[in-house]
Amino acid sequence: AFRYELFVPWTEMDYTPGPKTNNYPQYCVAEDNLIHDIGLVEKQVAGVQISMSAHITTRHNSIYNLPRAGINIGDGCWGGHIIEYNDVFNTVLETGDHGAFNSWGRDRFWSPERAVIDSIVAAKPGIELLDVIDPIIIRNNRFHCDHGWDIDLDDGSSNYEIYNNVCVSGGLKFREGYTRIVKNNILVNNTFHPPVWLKKSGDDFLHNIVTTPYAPILMNNWGNKIDSNFFLSEAGLAEAQKLGLDKHSRWGDAAFANAKSGNYRVSSSSPALAIGFRNFDMNFGVTNKRLKQEAKVPLIKNLLTNVGQEKGEQIEWLGAKFKNIETLGEQSAAGLH
């Protein structure tokens, strides 16, 4: 769907995978750029915008002070992108329902109605990966967003591999989509936000370090596997296990090298290693000597631990339950702006 209200019925779709022609950007590289304080007039901007292209690499960029996303993939087709070693922070300063990294899919299978997507994919298995024909990889980045999510996969974003990232503020949100493999990330002072997942989505969330309890919204399905994660609070693990998740996960002190300075490598004695977490390269941002001297870095906040997830009061009326919209996640899941 190009827009929420414009659809081609799935029975009329072309089921040939990928693009009709090769007339689109391919194998381009955006590397070692310092991008900041943009979007002074037009607010719907991004430091790097990728759309209807394939195998685009975005590497070692420092991107900050923006009204919206630092890196945005609008339309996942045709996949194969690599987003790595970027430092993206102070984002979504003048808009909402977005992230430091943001994406949407809206591919051939997609509809704003979850039940419609489930019915389409059940009737035509494989339609969900006709457009993002190669995985999109997000690895070894530092993302920061105080007004949204550090990583925000929206509107059917599918076929992603996300690993070895430090999310220092807004956590990681996955709306409906398919085949998102998330491993070995660090979610500082936040958590995993899964709203409105689909049946048999094939999603994995494994070997991650998580600070606060998960924040699910309207979740009837939990993907393929959510397990072997490390929580910094006992409450986080307990809440996950109440949902039937994280049977083999643990909680405790991750033994970060120096959380106050933003060094989130764990010591050789860290209990996080027992659940499969591994240290990774954190050489974020520009590498050019002159640009590195000029580039800013995100403000590192104190590490929060033993933080619970407060739930708002529900009111019953005529057999139905009501509550106020209290979080950015609930606002996004309900499509309220």
Q: Where do the model's predicted regions map?
A:
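Extracellular, surface-exposed repeat architectures
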Residues: 43, 96, 110-117, 124-128, ...
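C-terminal accessory segments
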Residues: 245-293, 297-298
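Active-site-adjacent structural elements in folded domains
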Residues: 16, 42-48, 87, 102, ...
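Surface-exposed loop/turn motifs in large extracellular/passenger domains
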Residues: 2-31, 50-57, 76-82, 106-139, ...
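C-terminal recognition in membrane/secretory proteostasis and scaffolding
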Residues: 292-337
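Short glycine/acidic-rich loop motifs that flank beta-strands on beta-rich extracellular proteins
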Residues: 1-4, 23, 39-46, 67-76, ...
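Predominantly extracellular beta-rich ligand-binding scaffolds that present long acidic/polar faces
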Residues: 159-261
